[in-house]
């Protein structure tokens, strides 16, 4: 989405699709990969707002919710994994009261864009919804949030603060990996993708 901290990409399609590679590692029966808006497929409705200030807007999030509703008619259980910005989508879907969602895993994830903006001192995503009120709505879903000890894009302070706000909740866990934002996750995922996530 961004070439660097100050330059917006004209095409949000990742040059190194880590989330897709993580999905390929998973040996589950039915793995479905959802890209972000305007990745891989371009349309006349695509504009830079969709991968910058509006990336967590109501229209974007409701589109994913529609997909989730459709998938819920096909499968008895849904386990959501979100990488980087996709983690915010995963967290939002956890607030939709969909009974099919059994766990949430995030990897190097922007789990609260409002908090991240404060931590790294960037302009907030003004056209995106506020994530703070949503956190409690997903707190009964087993979650584990993986962060990289060398991640300079999404500092582990984000996960640490989230955990402190929810430290009394046994459903929410965080775990450190030896990784940066885009390096080290594939090897980590090979040994961790199938770890059970529960509220014990």
Regions found by a protein language model. Name each.
Residues 1-35, 40-42:
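Short, surface-exposed "cap/lid" segments of acyl-processing enzymes
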Residues 46-73:
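Alpha/beta-hydrolase active-site loop
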Residues 81-90:
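Gly/Ala-rich beta-loop-alpha elbow adjacent to hydrolase catalytic centers
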Residues 92-96:
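Active-site signature of alpha/beta-hydrolase-fold catalytic machinery across serine-
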Residues 99-113:
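A conserved short beta-strand
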Residues 109, 114-178:
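The feature captures the conserved acid-bearing segment of alpha/beta-hydrolase catalytic domains
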Residues 164-200:
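C-terminal catalytic histidine-bearing segment of alpha/beta-hydrolase fold enzymes
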């Amino acid at each position: 989405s961004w070439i660097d901290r100050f330059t917006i990409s004209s095409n949000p399609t990742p040059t190194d699709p880590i989330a897709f590679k993580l999905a390929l590692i998973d040996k589950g029966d039915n793995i479905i990969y959802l890209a972000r808006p305007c990745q891989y497929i371009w349309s006349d409705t695509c504009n830079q707002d969709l991968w910058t200030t509006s990336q967590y807007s109501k229209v974007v999030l409701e589109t994913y919710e529609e997909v989730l509703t459709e998938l819920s008619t096909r499968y008895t259980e849904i386990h959501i994994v979100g990488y980087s910005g996709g983690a915010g989508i995963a967290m939002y879907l956890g607030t939709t009261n969909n009974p099919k969602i059994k766990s949430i895993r995030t990897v190097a994830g922007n789990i609260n864009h409002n908090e991240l903006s404060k931590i790294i001192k960037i302009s907030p995503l003004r056209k995106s919804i506020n994530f703070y009120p949503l956190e409690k709505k997903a707190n009964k879903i087993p979650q584990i949030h993986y962060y990289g000890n060398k991640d300079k894009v999404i500092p582990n302070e984000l996960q640490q603060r989230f955990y402190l706000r929810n430290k009394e909740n046994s459903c929410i866990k965080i775990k450190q990996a030896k990784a940066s934002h885009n390096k080290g996750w594939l090897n980590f995922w090979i040994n961790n993708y199938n770890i059970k996530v529960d509220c014990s």
